[in-house]
Protein backbone atom coordinates (compact mmCIF):
# COMPACT_ATOMS: atom_id res chain seq x y z
CA UNK A 1 0.00 0.00 0.00
CA UNK A 2 1.22 3.45 -0.90
CA UNK A 3 0.42 6.46 1.29
CA UNK A 4 0.70 9.51 -1.00
CA UNK A 5 1.99 12.69 0.54
CA UNK A 6 1.46 14.81 -2.60
CA UNK A 7 5.03 16.02 -2.33
CA UNK A 8 7.79 16.53 -4.87
CA UNK A 9 11.49 17.35 -4.79
CA UNK A 10 10.55 21.01 -5.41
CA UNK A 11 8.50 21.30 -2.23
CA UNK A 12 9.77 23.31 0.71
CA UNK A 13 9.59 21.47 4.02
CA UNK A 14 9.52 23.64 7.11
CA UNK A 15 10.92 22.76 10.53
CA UNK A 16 8.20 22.34 13.11
CA UNK A 17 8.24 24.56 16.18
CA UNK A 18 8.16 22.01 18.96
CA UNK A 19 6.85 23.12 22.36
CA UNK A 20 6.41 21.19 25.60
CA UNK A 21 2.84 20.01 26.04
CA UNK A 22 1.77 20.55 22.41
CA UNK A 23 -0.48 18.03 20.69
CA UNK A 24 1.32 16.02 18.02
CA UNK A 25 0.31 13.33 15.54
CA UNK A 26 2.01 11.21 12.88
CA UNK A 27 1.85 14.01 10.30
CA UNK A 28 4.09 16.20 12.46
CA UNK A 29 6.72 13.48 12.65
CA UNK A 30 6.44 12.78 8.93
CA UNK A 31 6.89 16.48 8.16
CA UNK A 32 10.05 16.57 10.30
CA UNK A 33 11.36 13.43 8.61
CA UNK A 34 10.71 14.93 5.17
CA UNK A 35 12.51 18.12 6.15
CA UNK A 36 15.69 16.22 6.97
CA UNK A 37 15.37 13.98 3.90
CA UNK A 38 14.91 17.01 1.67
CA UNK A 39 17.91 18.76 3.22
CA UNK A 40 20.05 15.67 2.72
CA UNK A 41 19.04 15.32 -0.96
CA UNK A 42 19.80 18.98 -1.63
CA UNK A 43 23.23 18.62 -0.04
CA UNK A 44 23.98 15.55 -2.18
CA UNK A 45 22.72 17.29 -5.30
CA UNK A 46 25.14 20.18 -4.86
CA UNK A 47 28.09 17.79 -4.67
CA UNK A 48 27.12 15.56 -7.61
CA UNK A 49 28.93 16.38 -10.88
CA UNK A 50 26.92 16.88 -14.07
CA UNK A 51 27.26 13.21 -15.04
CA UNK A 52 27.31 11.85 -11.49
CA UNK A 53 23.98 10.06 -11.74
CA UNK A 54 23.21 6.57 -13.02
CA UNK A 55 23.71 2.94 -12.03
CA UNK A 56 25.96 2.16 -9.07
CA UNK A 57 28.20 -0.92 -8.71
CA UNK A 58 26.79 -3.62 -6.44
CA UNK A 59 29.59 -5.00 -4.26
CA UNK A 60 27.57 -8.16 -3.64
CA UNK A 61 27.59 -9.17 -7.32
CA UNK A 62 30.21 -10.59 -9.67
CA UNK A 63 31.41 -8.36 -12.50
CA UNK A 64 29.42 -10.25 -15.14
CA UNK A 65 26.17 -9.58 -13.22
CA UNK A 66 26.62 -5.82 -12.76
CA UNK A 67 23.83 -3.60 -14.09
CA UNK A 68 20.06 -3.64 -13.79
CA UNK A 69 18.43 -7.08 -13.78
CA UNK A 70 15.39 -6.56 -15.97
CA UNK A 71 13.09 -8.69 -18.13
CA UNK A 72 10.87 -7.77 -21.07
CA UNK A 73 8.10 -10.02 -22.37
CA UNK A 74 5.91 -9.55 -25.44
CA UNK A 75 2.88 -11.64 -24.53
CA UNK A 76 0.55 -13.61 -26.81
CA UNK A 77 -2.13 -11.01 -26.04
CA UNK A 78 0.10 -8.37 -27.70
CA UNK A 79 1.10 -6.65 -24.50
CA UNK A 80 4.58 -5.64 -23.38
CA UNK A 81 5.47 -6.48 -19.81
CA UNK A 82 8.58 -4.99 -18.21
CA UNK A 83 9.73 -6.38 -14.89
CA UNK A 84 12.67 -5.13 -12.80
CA UNK A 85 14.26 -7.66 -10.46
CA UNK A 86 17.18 -5.59 -9.19
CA UNK A 87 18.40 -2.02 -9.50
CA UNK A 88 21.01 0.06 -7.69
CA UNK A 89 21.62 3.65 -8.73
CA UNK A 90 21.61 7.31 -7.82
CA UNK A 91 19.38 10.00 -9.31
CA UNK A 92 20.39 13.55 -10.22
CA UNK A 93 18.85 14.70 -6.94
CA UNK A 94 21.18 12.41 -5.00
CA UNK A 95 18.54 9.85 -4.06
CA UNK A 96 19.85 6.26 -3.81
CA UNK A 97 17.65 3.70 -5.57
CA UNK A 98 18.14 0.24 -4.06
CA UNK A 99 15.46 -2.15 -5.25
CA UNK A 100 15.34 -5.96 -5.07
CA UNK A 101 12.26 -7.88 -6.16
CA UNK A 102 10.88 -10.48 -3.81
CA UNK A 103 12.17 -8.79 -0.68
CA UNK A 104 8.89 -6.91 -0.23
CA UNK A 105 5.65 -8.11 -1.81
CA UNK A 106 4.30 -4.57 -1.61
CA UNK A 107 7.02 -3.28 -3.96
CA UNK A 108 6.61 -5.32 -7.16
CA UNK A 109 8.18 -3.16 -9.87
CA UNK A 110 6.62 -3.92 -13.25
CA UNK A 111 4.54 -2.34 -15.97
CA UNK A 112 2.27 -3.80 -18.67
CA UNK A 113 1.48 -1.73 -21.76
CA UNK A 114 -0.56 -2.70 -24.85
CA UNK A 115 1.90 -3.02 -27.75
CA UNK A 116 -0.40 -0.98 -29.97
CA UNK A 117 -0.08 1.95 -27.56
CA UNK A 118 3.70 1.90 -28.04
CA UNK A 119 3.44 1.52 -31.82
CA UNK A 120 1.31 4.66 -32.05
CA UNK A 121 4.25 6.66 -30.69
CA UNK A 122 6.60 5.63 -33.51
CA UNK A 123 7.77 8.70 -35.43
CA UNK A 124 9.91 8.27 -38.53
CA UNK A 125 12.75 5.86 -37.82
CA UNK A 126 12.56 6.21 -34.05
CA UNK A 127 11.75 2.70 -32.85
CA UNK A 128 13.47 2.73 -29.47
CA UNK A 129 12.19 3.75 -26.06
CA UNK A 130 13.97 4.42 -22.80
CA UNK A 131 12.78 2.42 -19.80
CA UNK A 132 12.55 4.92 -16.96
CA UNK A 133 12.33 4.46 -13.22
CA UNK A 134 10.85 7.36 -11.28
CA UNK A 135 11.26 7.54 -7.53
CA UNK A 136 8.92 9.51 -5.28
CA UNK A 137 10.91 9.93 -2.05
CA UNK A 138 8.02 11.41 -0.07
CA UNK A 139 5.42 8.80 -0.94
CA UNK A 140 5.43 6.13 1.73
CA UNK A 141 5.08 2.49 0.64
CA UNK A 142 4.28 0.23 3.58
CA UNK A 143 6.78 -2.60 4.02
CA UNK A 144 7.78 -5.36 6.38
CA UNK A 145 5.61 -7.86 8.24
CA UNK A 146 2.52 -6.36 9.91
CA UNK A 147 2.74 -6.39 13.68
CA UNK A 148 -0.73 -7.16 15.04
CA UNK A 149 0.53 -6.95 18.61
CA UNK A 150 0.91 -3.19 18.41
CA UNK A 151 -1.87 -0.67 18.78
CA UNK A 152 -2.92 0.20 16.22
CA UNK A 153 -1.72 -2.79 14.12
CA UNK A 154 0.65 -1.51 11.46
CA UNK A 155 3.40 -2.27 8.98
CA UNK A 156 6.70 -1.51 10.74
CA UNK A 157 8.47 0.30 7.88
CA UNK A 158 7.97 2.50 4.84
CA UNK A 159 9.95 2.85 1.63
CA UNK A 160 9.79 5.34 -1.25
CA UNK A 161 7.53 4.70 -4.22
CA UNK A 162 8.99 3.49 -7.53
CA UNK A 163 7.21 3.55 -10.89
CA UNK A 164 8.20 2.41 -14.40
CA UNK A 165 7.41 4.17 -17.66
CA UNK A 166 8.46 4.27 -21.32
CA UNK A 167 9.63 7.34 -23.21
CA UNK A 168 10.74 7.69 -26.86
CA UNK A 169 14.48 8.38 -26.79
CA UNK A 170 14.15 11.73 -28.58
CA UNK A 171 11.60 12.96 -26.02
CA UNK A 172 13.22 11.66 -22.84
CA UNK A 173 13.89 14.24 -20.12
CA UNK A 174 16.04 13.13 -17.19
CA UNK A 175 14.49 14.98 -14.28
CA UNK A 176 15.85 15.02 -10.75
CA UNK A 177 14.31 11.73 -9.62
CA UNK A 178 14.46 9.66 -12.82
CA UNK A 179 16.86 6.89 -13.85
CA UNK A 180 17.23 5.27 -17.27
CA UNK A 181 17.35 1.53 -16.62
CA UNK A 182 17.52 0.25 -20.19
CA UNK A 183 16.09 0.52 -23.67
CA UNK A 184 13.25 -1.15 -25.52
CA UNK A 185 13.58 -1.77 -29.26
CA UNK A 186 11.18 -2.89 -31.95
CA UNK A 187 12.11 -5.79 -34.22
CA UNK A 188 9.42 -6.45 -36.80
CA UNK A 189 6.24 -6.30 -34.78
CA UNK A 190 7.85 -7.54 -31.57
CA UNK A 191 9.29 -5.51 -28.70
CA UNK A 192 12.55 -6.66 -27.12
CA UNK A 193 15.07 -5.48 -24.55
CA UNK A 194 18.03 -3.81 -26.29
CA UNK A 195 20.99 -5.66 -24.77
CA UNK A 196 23.49 -3.45 -26.63
CA UNK A 197 22.37 -0.34 -24.74
CA UNK A 198 24.39 0.84 -21.76
CA UNK A 199 22.39 3.14 -19.45
CA UNK A 200 24.02 6.03 -17.57
CA UNK A 201 26.53 4.66 -15.03
CA UNK A 202 28.54 6.25 -12.25
CA UNK A 203 31.58 4.03 -12.86
CA UNK A 204 32.84 1.31 -15.19
CA UNK A 205 32.20 -1.28 -12.48
CA UNK A 206 28.46 -0.51 -12.53
CA UNK A 207 27.81 -2.41 -15.77
CA UNK A 208 29.18 -5.69 -17.14
CA UNK A 209 29.59 -4.27 -20.66
CA UNK A 210 31.68 -1.35 -19.40
CA UNK A 211 33.92 -3.79 -17.53
CA UNK A 212 34.34 -5.75 -20.77
CA UNK A 213 35.31 -2.54 -22.58
CA UNK A 214 37.87 -1.71 -19.89
CA UNK A 215 39.52 -5.08 -20.34
CA UNK A 216 39.36 -5.11 -24.14
CA UNK A 217 40.68 -1.55 -24.44
CA UNK A 218 43.38 -2.41 -21.93
CA UNK A 219 44.56 -5.26 -24.14
CA UNK A 220 44.80 -2.97 -27.17
CA UNK A 221 46.40 -0.20 -25.10
CA UNK A 222 49.01 -2.68 -23.91
CA UNK A 223 49.58 -3.91 -27.47
CA UNK A 224 50.06 -0.35 -28.76
CA UNK A 225 52.58 0.40 -26.00
CA UNK A 226 54.58 -2.79 -26.61
CA UNK A 227 54.55 -2.27 -30.39
CA UNK A 228 55.68 1.34 -29.93
CA UNK A 229 58.68 0.17 -27.88
CA UNK A 230 59.58 -2.42 -30.52
CA UNK A 231 59.27 0.08 -33.37
CA UNK A 232 61.50 2.62 -31.62
CA UNK A 233 64.09 -0.09 -30.92
CA UNK A 234 64.10 -1.20 -34.56
CA UNK A 235 64.55 2.35 -35.83
CA UNK A 236 67.24 3.60 -33.44
CA UNK A 237 69.31 0.44 -33.84
CA UNK A 238 69.76 1.05 -37.56
CA UNK A 239 72.06 3.69 -38.96
CA UNK A 240 70.25 3.78 -42.30
CA UNK A 241 66.70 4.43 -41.08
CA UNK A 242 64.58 6.34 -43.58
CA UNK A 243 62.58 9.52 -42.81
CA UNK A 244 59.44 7.36 -42.75
CA UNK A 245 60.96 5.14 -40.07
CA UNK A 246 62.24 8.10 -38.04
CA UNK A 247 58.87 9.86 -38.17
CA UNK A 248 57.07 6.66 -37.15
CA UNK A 249 59.44 6.35 -34.19
CA UNK A 250 58.69 9.97 -33.20
CA UNK A 251 54.97 9.17 -33.03
CA UNK A 252 55.77 6.06 -30.99
CA UNK A 253 57.84 8.11 -28.54
CA UNK A 254 54.90 10.49 -28.02
CA UNK A 255 52.64 7.50 -27.37
CA UNK A 256 55.14 6.05 -24.88
CA UNK A 257 55.36 9.35 -22.99
CA UNK A 258 51.57 9.29 -22.69
CA UNK A 259 51.31 5.64 -21.60
CA UNK A 260 53.98 6.28 -18.95
CA UNK A 261 51.75 8.96 -17.42
CA UNK A 262 48.64 6.73 -17.56
CA UNK A 263 50.19 3.43 -16.45
CA UNK A 264 49.74 3.56 -12.67
CA UNK A 265 46.31 5.15 -12.58
CA UNK A 266 44.93 2.96 -15.37
CA UNK A 267 46.17 -0.23 -13.76
CA UNK A 268 45.12 0.53 -10.18
CA UNK A 269 42.15 2.88 -10.52
CA UNK A 270 40.95 2.55 -14.12
CA UNK A 271 38.30 -0.04 -13.34
CA UNK A 272 36.62 2.47 -11.01
CA UNK A 273 36.75 5.44 -13.38
CA UNK A 274 33.67 7.29 -14.52
CA UNK A 275 32.88 6.35 -18.16
CA UNK A 276 33.70 9.91 -19.24
CA UNK A 277 37.24 9.56 -17.89
CA UNK A 278 37.77 6.36 -19.86
CA UNK A 279 36.67 8.15 -23.03
CA UNK A 280 38.98 11.05 -22.15
CA UNK A 281 41.93 8.66 -21.73
CA UNK A 282 41.66 7.28 -25.25
CA UNK A 283 40.45 10.47 -26.91
CA UNK A 284 43.65 12.08 -25.60
CA UNK A 285 45.68 9.24 -27.13
CA UNK A 286 44.07 9.95 -30.50
CA UNK A 287 44.86 13.64 -30.05
CA UNK A 288 48.53 12.85 -29.37
CA UNK A 289 48.75 10.75 -32.54
CA UNK A 290 47.00 13.46 -34.54
CA UNK A 291 49.26 16.24 -33.27
CA UNK A 292 52.40 14.15 -33.78
CA UNK A 293 51.45 13.64 -37.42
CA UNK A 294 50.73 17.31 -37.91
CA UNK A 295 54.10 18.35 -36.48
CA UNK A 296 55.65 16.80 -39.60
CA UNK A 297 56.39 18.73 -42.76
CA UNK A 298 53.50 18.38 -45.20
CA UNK A 299 55.18 16.05 -47.72
CA UNK A 300 56.65 13.90 -44.93
CA UNK A 301 53.21 13.55 -43.38
CA UNK A 302 51.70 12.57 -46.74
CA UNK A 303 54.46 10.00 -47.34
CA UNK A 304 53.99 8.53 -43.87
CA UNK A 305 50.22 8.30 -44.18
CA UNK A 306 50.59 6.67 -47.59
CA UNK A 307 53.06 4.21 -46.08
CA UNK A 308 50.57 3.33 -43.35
CA UNK A 309 48.00 2.77 -46.10
CA UNK A 310 50.25 0.17 -47.73
CA UNK A 311 50.30 -1.94 -44.58
CA UNK A 312 46.88 -1.36 -43.07
CA UNK A 313 44.46 -0.90 -45.99
CA UNK A 314 43.24 2.24 -44.22
CA UNK A 315 43.44 5.25 -46.49
CA UNK A 316 44.99 8.49 -45.17
CA UNK A 317 41.55 10.11 -45.21
CA UNK A 318 40.00 7.21 -43.29
CA UNK A 319 42.85 7.14 -40.75
CA UNK A 320 42.56 10.86 -40.07
CA UNK A 321 38.80 10.47 -39.84
CA UNK A 322 39.20 7.81 -37.14
CA UNK A 323 41.46 10.12 -35.14
CA UNK A 324 39.18 13.11 -35.61
CA UNK A 325 36.14 11.12 -34.51
CA UNK A 326 37.92 10.03 -31.34
CA UNK A 327 39.15 13.57 -30.67
CA UNK A 328 35.82 15.29 -31.32
CA UNK A 329 33.63 12.99 -29.21
CA UNK A 330 30.87 14.88 -27.45
CA UNK A 331 30.19 12.81 -24.36
CA UNK A 332 26.56 11.76 -23.96
CA UNK A 333 25.88 10.19 -20.58
CA UNK A 334 22.68 8.60 -21.91
CA UNK A 335 24.40 7.14 -25.01
CA UNK A 336 27.65 5.57 -23.78
CA UNK A 337 27.74 2.89 -26.47
CA UNK A 338 28.30 5.40 -29.30
CA UNK A 339 31.39 6.92 -27.68
CA UNK A 340 32.90 3.54 -26.81
CA UNK A 341 32.30 2.29 -30.35
CA UNK A 342 34.24 5.26 -31.78
CA UNK A 343 37.15 4.62 -29.41
CA UNK A 344 37.10 0.91 -30.23
CA UNK A 345 37.43 1.60 -33.97
CA UNK A 346 40.41 3.91 -33.42
CA UNK A 347 42.23 1.59 -31.01
CA UNK A 348 41.70 -1.45 -33.20
CA UNK A 349 43.03 0.32 -36.30
CA UNK A 350 46.09 1.72 -34.50
CA UNK A 351 46.84 -1.55 -32.71
CA UNK A 352 46.67 -3.62 -35.91
CA UNK A 353 48.77 -1.10 -37.86
CA UNK A 354 51.46 -0.98 -35.16
CA UNK A 355 51.60 -4.78 -34.93
CA UNK A 356 51.96 -4.96 -38.70
CA UNK A 357 54.88 -2.52 -38.63
CA UNK A 358 56.59 -4.49 -35.85
CA UNK A 359 56.44 -7.61 -38.02
CA UNK A 360 58.53 -5.90 -40.74
CA UNK A 361 62.26 -6.55 -40.86
CA UNK A 362 62.87 -2.99 -42.03
CA UNK A 363 60.47 -0.17 -41.23
CA UNK A 364 60.38 2.41 -43.99
CA UNK A 365 60.76 0.35 -47.12
CA UNK A 366 57.71 -0.07 -49.29
CA UNK A 367 55.62 -3.17 -49.73
CA UNK A 368 57.00 -4.16 -53.13
CA UNK A 369 60.60 -4.61 -51.92
CA UNK A 370 60.46 -5.59 -48.28
CA UNK A 371 60.84 -8.82 -46.38
CA UNK A 372 58.01 -9.54 -43.98
CA UNK A 373 59.01 -11.15 -40.70
CA UNK A 374 56.93 -13.65 -38.81
CA UNK A 375 53.88 -12.03 -37.23
CA UNK A 376 53.84 -12.87 -33.55
CA UNK A 377 50.56 -11.46 -32.41
CA UNK A 378 47.09 -12.83 -32.05
CA UNK A 379 43.59 -11.48 -31.76
CA UNK A 380 43.37 -8.61 -29.26
CA UNK A 381 40.63 -10.42 -27.39
CA UNK A 382 42.94 -13.36 -26.65
CA UNK A 383 45.37 -13.80 -23.81
CA UNK A 384 48.65 -11.95 -23.77
CA UNK A 385 51.88 -12.85 -22.01
CA UNK A 386 52.51 -9.13 -21.45
CA UNK A 387 51.05 -7.00 -18.67
CA UNK A 388 47.45 -5.96 -19.10
CA UNK A 389 45.59 -3.54 -16.79
CA UNK A 390 43.37 -6.28 -15.43
CA UNK A 391 46.02 -8.91 -14.60
CA UNK A 392 45.36 -8.34 -10.91
CA UNK A 393 41.58 -8.31 -11.20
Predicted regions and their residues:
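Short, flexible loop/turn elements at secondary-structure junctions
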Residues: 91-93, 103, 135-139
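Short amphipathic beta-strand/extended segments with alternating polar/hydrophobic composition
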Residues: 97-105, 196
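Extended, amphipathic alpha-helical scaffolds
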Residues: 268-393
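N-terminal "first-domain core" detector
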Residues: 7-96
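Short linear, low-complexity motifs centered on an aromatic residue
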Residues: 43-53, 145-158
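Non-catalytic accessory regions used for complex assembly or targeting
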Residues: 4-12, 17-23, 27-31, 35-40, ...
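Mixed-charge (acidic/basic) macromolecular-recognition segments
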Residues: 4, 147-286
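Elongated alpha-helical scaffolds
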Residues: 108-147
Amino acid sequence: KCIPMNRSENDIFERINWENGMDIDANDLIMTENFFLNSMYKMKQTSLPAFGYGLLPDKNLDTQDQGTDMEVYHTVTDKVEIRVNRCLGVTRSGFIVDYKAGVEDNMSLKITIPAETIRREITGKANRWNILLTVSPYERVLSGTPDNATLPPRFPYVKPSYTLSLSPIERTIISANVLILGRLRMEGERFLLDYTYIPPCTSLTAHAELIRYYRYFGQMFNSIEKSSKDIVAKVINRSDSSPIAINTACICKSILHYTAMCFFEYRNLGMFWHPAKMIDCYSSLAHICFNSLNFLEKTEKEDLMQYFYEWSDISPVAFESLMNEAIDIEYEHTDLQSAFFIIEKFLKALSELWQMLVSLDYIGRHKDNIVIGERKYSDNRGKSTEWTPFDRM
